[in-house]
């Protein structure tokens, strides 16, 4: 089989992708047998192409699954860990903007009773 285009794979359904994956795996098994038995050199070079094709099919399958999950969890309150945005550990533990902006009663009173003085300059 020749190399496949990923944009063609994206148009296929899940069952078609699974079938194509089975075909590629079967072909890879045949090529490996040919390698052991001393097959033609063109078959040996084809192993790399088939392995890449398998990887492409698996990638498209996983991308489709992930996009379907994103759609399913679109308006939910909690998201699975693998769908949350990837951030550093420190950023994930940081206070939210709302939490950081909260003030104590004492701070509020101090600001209310002693506001920042405004000065006007005479010209």
From Swiss-Prot:
SUPFAM superfamilies: Ribosomal protein L29 (L29p) (SSF46561). PROSITE patterns: RIBOSOMAL_L29. Keywords: Ribonucleoprotein, Ribosomal protein. Transmembrane segments: none annotated. One of its GO terms (cellular component) is cytosolic large ribosomal subunit. Gene3D superfamilies: 1.10.287.310, 6.10.250.3450. Signal peptide: none annotated. Coiled coil: none annotated. GO terms for biological process: maturation of LSU-rRNA from tricistronic rRNA transcript (SSU-rRNA, 5.8S rRNA, LSU-rRNA); translation. It holds the Pfam family Ribosomal_L29. GO terms for molecular function: structural constituent of ribosome. HAMAP family: Ribosomal_uL29. Belongs to the universal ribosomal protein uL29 family. This is Large ribosomal subunit protein uL29w. It comes from Arabidopsis thaliana (Mouse-ear cress).
